[in-house]
Amino acid sequence: MPGNSIGKIFKVTTCGESHGPMLAGIIDGVPPGLSLNNKDIQYELNRRRPGFSKFTSQRREKDKVEIFSGIFKGITTGTSIGIRIKNIDIRSQDYSEIKNLYRPNHADYTYEKKYGIRDYRGGGRSSARETAIRVAAGAIAKKYLKLQHNIKIRGYLSQIGSIYCPFQSWEEVEKNPFFCSNSEKIKKIIHFIKKLKKSGNSVGAKITIIAKNVPIGLGEPVFDRLNAEIAHSIMSINAAKSIEIGDGIHVAKQTGVEHRDEILPNGFSSNHSGGILGGISNGEEIIVHAAFKPTSSIKIPGKTIDTFGKKRFIITKGRHDPCVGIRAVPIAEAMLAITLMDHVLRFKAQCGK
């Protein structure tokens, strides 16, 4: 599978499956001299890890990261950073009854048709379990971007099902298990999730990720425009179905006067473009919205076929998130950080600043 790496200079390569012994990653391109330890990475992993909220998957993984290369006396050496995370809470028996069935809306069907073989245990490589390494790599990128350029990347839940969550405060985001910034919506979300879990159903969600203090000049037109690279990274996340930058799909109903970000001596009058013009960052906040489909593994019987092409009904057991979009917040933050880190280094390599 050649699609296991992302980035040109800051390059992240991952490997591992949902029910394999571990997940691992190699991060290339980290400049030497960056102070880095397990705690820097663990904080971000703890935000993503499953099993510590009754509203997400009950698979309990500690997600303790181990750095095994690229660090000497707590400082990056400029060589490849190797990281690994052990899988501990594996229950492969939950999938024994459906190993010959294709789960609707999962990667089971396409993986087997492409490769002629698939790991049915928790989805194998196609599982969102793989994103733990992305979050670890993103933690490194976040630290470098904050220390070198004061770039801060944060995200929040902006919609779950039909519940809209207008932004209220960043302080509220870390106070609840939904990454919701609006305290007035928490009780409604809790009631909604409980109802979903009881019925065995799931729901989609929309999240918003914002990068602040991004310098002017990031992005490589024409094919590696910053918005194109961000779209690539976000859409590589499991269950991601759409991405918007700035006003996104709303630009279709705007006029030129409404949409244009007028330029004033002290900056732009608005940010409809989401911080990117001509594929290059313009110094404004980069604003990204991403929508995630409902969890495909649900306990409500559905139609499918088996590996022999015969009609079957399927109920997916196991421990699954009623809404995968919730835990996508730290994952999307990580992917935006990885993309910006790569482009910061590419800018320095080309422009020498």
Swiss-Prot record:
Reduced FMN (FMNH(2)). Keywords: Amino-acid biosynthesis, Aromatic amino acid biosynthesis, FAD, Flavoprotein, FMN, Lyase, NADP. It comes from Buchnera aphidicola subsp. Cinara cedri (strain Cc). GO terms for biological process: amino acid biosynthetic process; aromatic amino acid family biosynthetic process; chorismate biosynthetic process. Its cofactor is FMNH2. The keyword Coiled coil does not apply. This is Chorismate synthase. Belongs to the chorismate synthase family. This reaction introduces a second double bond into the aromatic ring system. Pfam families: Chorismate_synt (PF01264). Homotetramer. One of its GO terms (molecular function) is chorismate synthase activity. NADP(+) binds at R48. InterPro entries: Chorismate_synth, Chorismate_synth_AroC_sf, Chorismate_synthase_CS. PANTHER family: CHORISMATE SYNTHASE.
